Amino acid sequence: MSLRNDEQTEKGAVVGKVDSQLSGPGQEEIIQVQTQKPFTTLSAIGIGYGVTNTAVGLLLVLGTGIPMGGSPVIFWGFLAMAAVGLATATTLSELISAIPHPGGQYIWVHKIAPERYRRGLSYATAMISWIAAIAIGASGNLAVPVNAFTIVTLLNPNFVYQRWMGFVVFQLINIVTCFGACFEYFLPKISKALLLVNVLSVSAIIITLFATAKTHTSAKDFFKVVNVSGWPNGVAFLIGLNGSNWCFSCLDVATHLAEEIPSPSTNIPKALIWTIVIAFSSGLLMILAVLVNVGPINTPDYSGLTVLHHITGSKAAAIGLWVPVLFLVFASVWSIQTWQSRLAWSISRESGFPLHRHFSKIFPAPFYTPIWSLIGSAIGTALFGCLYLASELAFNSLIATGILLQYASYSIPTILVLYRGRSKFQHGPFWYPKLGFMANIVMLAWTLVALIFYCFPVYSEVIPSQVNYVSAVLILIAILITSLWFLYAKKHYHVVEI
């Protein structure tokens, strides 16, 4: 059944006329597809920050910045990415305030683009957004087992991790989080609870690191550049920003809750800006707690657990701090499942997928969620997991495109706004003419920089296991989306809800 002529009832329920396959061609029935708007600004922050997860993410990506310049890359890189994150959040806030819709980026493009290119650009943006969400979901699914098995390695140095172990846990997490995202009633409650757990866990880690550290990093060492990548310092710095960049990613999550939160034109921008405030505050404290207290460390392994063990001097303490980190990463996968499914559901309402009649359905009580979109997105994530089992290098290249695809999906509507002229844009309540323009330029400039330097290998002297295939994957994704457009979407894809 496909949704048609949606209208808002007095109680906030969305009622849609649908073509019924049971009652015969041409007949219509009325079904209730959504009964409430359960999210508040706080719960939207919870689910948005639950994916961004800045402080926890910094612990996971410590090893990516150390070879590119050491502490300065991590510290200054974090500040730079916080500025980019604020610019991105401001840009998205202006767009969602003007055009509140769960489709987010692709709806903005359809609304703003010249009529001749509207459908094609909108569809490309929709698919870019969804593939990015799938790639990021796969990354989160794998982060849990890979980092969980570091506990085993810490306790038993002879343990050898095998890819099949991560694959099994990957798929189990995918199934469990998909099921957990099925119930609309619990989503805002869980997101608020997880936000509290996140704040308490991060606070406990920071306090423990300062309390247990026996050595400290001198000011000289804190700002000493140690670049072993083989690249010039400037190039290495830009490549090394990748880790910090992930900690300010996925900011569009809250925008896809536009039909599940009252007054989305004002509440979602609040959620976006507060997400950046929380991310910056918690992330800065975590970075200082680690870099100030780590001191000299004589090991090539700069994984989060190793650093915690080095600072605390206790395996038990390190593991005790690492377990809540793993839980919060697991929780972020649950938030990503919600994000993926809302995107797939919204795109399906425009007949963007071959199975759109199923993906566009909202299941009745006790779910009130797009179950088929959840399952479809989870299957996409599962397929990424199968790729990991076949080739870790191919998997890493694929998920690495996630952040670049995100920026691409943000940049397309932003470029269109600038092309038309910001003064001509029918903006919403969240609108800052000069600040917004600066935010647009900063985000677009960084998108271009990231697109170039994130395609570089980490080390200048490349060995087969370290080849960066991101550029090749981006080309394949472009070919895939183009093929889908000409084979299916050009005929079927139509945006009917603006």
From Swiss-Prot:
A Pfam family that the UniProt record links to this protein: AA_permease_2
InterPro entries reported in the protein's UniProt record: AA/rel_permease1
Stretches that traverse the bilayer: 42-64, 79-99, 126-146, 167-187, 193-213, 272-292, 316-336, 370-390, 398-418, 436-456, 469-489
Residue spans of biased composition, Basic and acidic residues class: 1-10
Keyword flag Glycoprotein: yes
Function of the protein: Transmembrane transporter; part of the gene cluster that mediates the biosynthesis of swainsonine, a cytotoxic fungal alkaloid and a potential cancer therapy drug. Does not mediate the secretion of SW and the exact role of swnT in SW biosynthesis remains to be determined.
GO CC, alphabetical: membrane
Recorded family membership: Belongs to the amino acid-polyamine-organocation (APC) superfamily. Amino acid/choline transporter (ACT) (TC 2.A.3.4) family.
Keyword flag Transferase: no
Annotated region (Disordered), positions in chain: 1-21
Protein name: Swainsonine transporter swnT
Gene Ontology MF terms in the entry: transmembrane transporter activity
Keywords: Glycoprotein, Membrane, Transmembrane, Transmembrane helix, Transport
Compartments in which it is found: Membrane
Taxonomic lineage of the native organism: Eukaryota, Fungi, Dikarya, Ascomycota, Pezizomycotina
UniProt-annotated glycosylation sites, renumbered to this chain: N227, N242
Membrane topology: Multi-pass membrane protein
Main localization of the protein described in the UniProt heading: membrane
